[in-house]
């Protein structure tokens, strides 16, 4: 009986976050993005996730630390599809430049032990400051850095599909 209870308990923990779907990314594109050649991605600070198992008197074994910088991830994605990043917005390039902003909007509980990280990305015309495109997306991975990476890629894919 104890063995059955233990198996049921393990199964409950293993499937606590399963079966819950992420919300589909919501994207709004108001203008042709490909009329722009340059992007200025507003700098963000890095996000770090750590995990580990304590191994006794000699410290942590099997630990892992991951760090991502959302603005660098967004910049890399945009470079890959043909945009050129610029370090600042200049007057001579303003009419061909998008200003891209990223924001972390929190978490959404998915199940007993799982949650999704939610983000928003906005793209504005550098000259007029009008909204050109935006998206809201969420991601759920092994840790917070994976969650944010998934959400960024999901949102950008929705904008550029």
Residue ranges and their predicted role:
Residues 7, 30, 110-112:
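Residues embedded in well-ordered secondary-structure elements
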Residues 150-161:
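Short, solvent-exposed cationic patches
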Residues 1-20:
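Sec-dependent bacterial lipoprotein signal peptides
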Residues 24-25, 58, 67-146, 150:
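Surface-exposed short loop/turn segments
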């Amino acid at each position: 009986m104890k063995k059955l209870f233990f198996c049921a308990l393990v199964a409950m923990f293993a499937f606590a976050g399963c079966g819950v779907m992420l919300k589909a990314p919501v994207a709004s594109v108001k203008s042709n993005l490909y009329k722009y050649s340059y992007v200025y991605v507003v700098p963000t600070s890095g996000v770090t996730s750590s995990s580990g198992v304590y191994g006794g008197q000699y410290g942590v074994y099997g630990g892992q630390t991951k760090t991502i910088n959302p603005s660098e991830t967004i910049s890399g994605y945009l470079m890959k599809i043909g945009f050129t990043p610029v370090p600042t917005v200049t007057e001579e390039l303003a009419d061909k430049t998008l200003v891209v902003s990223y924001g972390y909007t929190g978490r959404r509980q998915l199940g007993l032990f799982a949650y999704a990280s939610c983000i928003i990305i906005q793209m504005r015309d550098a000259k007029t400051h009008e909204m050109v495109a935006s998206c809201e997306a969420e991601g759920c991975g092994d840790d917070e850095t994976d969650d944010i990476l998934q959400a960024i890629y999901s949102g950008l894919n929705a904008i550029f599909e």
